[in-house]
């Protein structure tokens, strides 16, 4: 999954 993905961002923290 991409780093910045609105629907599925598992690489970055969801703030």
Curated annotation (Swiss-Prot):
Alphabetical GO CC annotations of the entry are:
extracellular region
Q: Does the keyword ATP-binding apply?
A: no
According to the UniProt record, list the residues that bear Leucine amide: 15
Keyword Secreted present in the record's keywords: the answer is: yes
Q: What is the recorded function of this protein according to its Swiss-Prot or TrEMBL entry?
A: FMRFamides and FMRFamide-like peptides are neuropeptides.
The alphabetized UniProt keywords are: Amidation, Neuropeptide, Secreted
Tell me the leader sequence span: none
Tell me the Gene Ontology biological-process terms attached to this UniProt entry: neuropeptide signaling pathway
**Location(s), subcellular:** Secreted
Q: What is this protein called?
A: Extended FMRFamide-12
**What family does the entry list?**
Belongs to the FARP (FMRF amide related peptide) family.
């Amino acid at each position: 999954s991409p780093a910045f993905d609105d629907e599925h961002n598992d690489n970055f923290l969801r703030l």
